[in-house]
């Protein structure tokens, strides 16, 4: 693994290895032992979008492993005043050992990786969110003991979380169901990837059908535009019937896990009651961002 730009950058073996390393690092952290795996390493933390979990978990993780993490709001760099990305990338590659970038366009992230000459980690793009999905898979494995053979159902917008969960779940040997309203399908290349897995993947517009016998149900915010705008109002109409509620969850297996990448818009993609009933696994999932990202850094920079 040279970079983590999207889940399909990983082989099944590499995915399992990252989760194994994350388990080890989490156990050491809980025991008060954190090896300085990043001693002398410098990590650029580039953010073009607002962030809570991604920013803080990377800052804490780099610090815990003895590295230097520099947070940068890209709007405050010369790139925010028109400097070409290709120039910024070649500069950062001379100062840093690794870069994390939370941005909009996947192609920009790929250009940073191509031109900087250093490992690049996707902190979220409009296309993919691999660090979050690694945390999701870690949480499932902690609570169920395995991933292979379990059914994972995602309900929501077929954007970055759907794209990454589909690929990650299939790589992990899971059955994956994706439930999206018409017009909100996952990316075409992700559906082509999933097609190779045959009956292990199912795409539907029917929430009850998609949730049937699911072991894990995941969702994410699908209305992140400004309230009251035409797009926001249209999404509220398009996603009627796609809110995770206790009644809808009855289609899944008893005691199914419920995951949410956060932030949660209670009353939109998930009911307040269901969110609070499953808060333990949701906030374990948030904590595991720290541990899986440390694992990714350890694999890329410390040869773990």
Show which residues each predicted segment covers:
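Positively charged, low-complexity intrinsically disordered leader regions
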Residues: 1-56, 60
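Active-site cofactor/substrate anionic-group-binding motifs, chiefly glycine-
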Residues: 42-43, 47-95
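Glycine-rich phosphate/diphosphate-binding loop of Rossmann-like nucleotide-binding domains
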Residues: 48-60, 142-220
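Short, structured coil segments at secondary-structure junctions
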Residues: 65, 95, 115-116, 172, ...
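Anion-binding alpha/beta catalytic cores of soluble intermediary-metabolism enzymes, centered on
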Residues: 90, 97-168, 260
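Rossmann-like adenosine-cofactor binding region
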Residues: 195-273
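Adenosine-phosphate binding glycine-rich loop
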Residues: 255-256, 261-304
